[in-house]
């Protein structure tokens, strides 16, 4: 969100099996995001406090930020009980004690919001030079190679992605804003450079236990479908052979039917790439805030959306999130002062949605 059961759900672990027409079985790994939460419970560094809570709930996939951009660097998003060292590269950031501790945890998949150091996350919208293009490729080749080498014997998967590309393309949170043709062209080049870097890292490392992929995240999908509005899905994705496409699914959270249609729409526009093939679209963010519904309704809607992601064959579906990051009152003090994007509330109680991860 902003920075900002295929008929039954098997309540057993975070990998949920569904039948597929294209192959006999496909598994959707249910994950949890931990990005920019507003409260904490322990004196553990915040990145790993949240990760430990995600593990306790039963998830084997976690989405975090690993970034040095000037908008939302990791030090800003994980501030509690943390002393972040000064580093200049993403591979150096990944090698800090906090991230080494995180990556040593028993998660199968790490989804990483990552941006090049020292620049705004969407700086390319205003200007994207040949030098920038080269720097992006080198940055992500270096990060990818570091992850592959460091975790070669672990069988862990790392997915490096942007965040909500349709907002980045517009430069604002107004869905009616029209992106410029120059911004669209720059985004294509920017994503292609990141993908080249990750592809280079894989080629240089060769085969091994760990896997690294690159994803493009989209978020304004429904309006592109029904209004033919400009979008990353229709105007960018067809032109870049990214490994995966991520859907931050807030525009269809009220309708499982529209959510399923959006997944199909994204897949229609994404180039099929190996090893995911027809299953190259995952849900990068989804859920239902408790401020808009009873806890029971929020659970039921989240379960319905998850069922559609399973039915479609998404490899991952990431619930937003472990701790809420959006206040409704300042300063937030009690549960009702937050929008309710959580698995753990500020008072320490658990959301019913945790049952989706229960053994």
Model region roles, listed by residue range:
Residues 6-15:
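Bacterial N-terminal signal peptides
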Residues 49-183, 205-210:
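Substrate-binding cleft and catalytic face of glycoside hydrolase catalytic domains
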Residues 29-34, 60-66, 109-113, 159-162, ...:
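Structural recognition of the beta-strand scaffold that forms the well-ordered cores
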Residues 46-50, 90-100, 220-236, 260-272, ...:
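Alpha-helical scaffolding within the catalytic cores
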Residues 233-294:
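Glycoside hydrolase catalytic-domain groove-lining segments
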Residues 157-163, 185-229, 276-287, 317-322:
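Aromatic-lined carbohydrate-recognition surfaces of secreted/lumenal glycan-active proteins
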């Amino acid at each position: 969100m902003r920075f900002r059961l295929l008929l039954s759900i098997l309540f057993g672990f975070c990998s949920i099996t569904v039948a597929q027409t294209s192959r006999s079985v496909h598994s959707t790994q249910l994950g949890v995001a931990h990005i920019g939460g507003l409260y904490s419970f322990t004196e553990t560094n915040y990145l790993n406090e949240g990760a430990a809570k995600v593990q306790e709930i039963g998830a084997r996939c976690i989405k975090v930020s690993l970034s040095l951009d000037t908008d939302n660097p990791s030090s800003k998003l994980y501030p509690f009980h943390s002393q972040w060292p000064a580093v200049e590269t993403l591979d150096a950031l990944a090698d800090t004690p906090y991230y080494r501790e995180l990556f040593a945890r028993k998660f199968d998949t790490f989804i990483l919001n990552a941006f090049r150091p020292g620049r705004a996350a969407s700086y390319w919208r205003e200007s994207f030079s040949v030098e920038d293009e080269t720097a992006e490729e080198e940055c992500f080749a270096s990060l990818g190679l570091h992850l592959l080498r460091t975790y070669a014997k672990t069988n862990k998967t790392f997915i490096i992605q942007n965040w909500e590309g349709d907002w980045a393309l517009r430069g604002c949170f107004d869905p009616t804003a029209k992106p410029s043709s120059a911004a669209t062209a720059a985004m294509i080049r920017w994503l292609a450079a990141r993908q080249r870097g990750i592809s280079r890292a894989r080629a240089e490392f060769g085969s091994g236990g760990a896997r690294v992929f690159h994803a493009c995240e989209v978020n304004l999908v429904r309006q592109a479908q029904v209004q033919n509005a400009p979008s990353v899905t229709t105007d960018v994705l067809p032109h870049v052979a990214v490994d995966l496409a991520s859907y931050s699914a807030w525009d269809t959270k009220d309708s499982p039917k529209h959510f399923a249609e959006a997944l199909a729409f994204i897949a229609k526009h994404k180039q099929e790439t190996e090893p995911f093939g027809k299953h190259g679209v995952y849900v990068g963010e989804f859920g239902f805030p408790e401020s808009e519904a009873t806890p029971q309704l929020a659970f039921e809607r989240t379960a319905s959306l998850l069922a559609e992601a399973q039915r479609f064959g998404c490899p991952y579906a990431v619930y937003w999130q472990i701790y809420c990051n959006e206040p409704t009152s300042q300063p937030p003090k009690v549960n009702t002062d937050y929008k309710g994007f959580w698995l753990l509330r500020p008072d320490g109680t658990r959301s019913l949605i945790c049952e989706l991860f229960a053994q």
